[in-house]
Amino acid sequence: GAKEVLRPGPPGTSYTFDSETIAAVNPGPMLGPVWNGQPTDIINILYADNAEFSHPLNDHPLAAIAANGSSITVSNLTPLNRMDNPIRVGDLIALSNAKGSTLQYVTDVSGQTITFGANDPMNLNQPGAPAGSVTQIGNGDGTFPTTTAMRVYLITYYLDFNEDPETPRLIRRINNDPGRTVALILENLQLSYDLVDGVTNPTAVKNAVSPNSPSQIRKANILLSGRSAAKNRTTGDFLRRSLTTQVSLRSLSYIDRYE
């Protein structure tokens, strides 16, 4: 059978996505490390590469796709070696055509050919999978409709208390690459979400569970708590503060209010 797609998370975890569809926003309530008895949250965000200006990968249809979907040949009108940010091993490529879309993990790049080898670190390259695989967007005879490719990024945020327990930090992880520190001395990360379903429009929920879905998320409510680097000489304790904010999200689904 098909392997579950691995979900990037904190070091030492082996999370998987709940379905073959990776949403634009993937809540991860209580999947982060525990701090002072409080489980923290993680989040995975999927978005298209919008920073490639000279030769966007989706400017022209692909020149060819291997019959089993294991590789693609990019049009010479999109020279890979002249991209602002060249395609590399570990990138994620979305293939789209009239049959649907699928996400693949780059295992090799040679000339204009991008390869999606088996047994990739995220289990994305499974041409034999019954759903969500590259063969599902083919014609069934080894050929494919006109197909475009686009690089996408899967960004994961979580807290890390292991690298230096004295300096807990916020980590940003791109695809399956190692995480990088983006902020220091943060002790708590909590997320909730406002949904638009056209019926009850739930607010401040920790996850979008059935009958709702992550595609209905319209707003993320974020709480970050941090402390000072040194203890206060008077109180002998750290100074702690919390920041709350909201981030509005667009274009995750469409509801016709005039129907």
Feature roles, as predicted:
Residues 2-36, 120-259:
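Short linear sequence signals and composition-biased patches located at protein termini or domain-edge surfaces
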Residues 12-129:
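Autoprocessing Asn-cyclization modules and mimics
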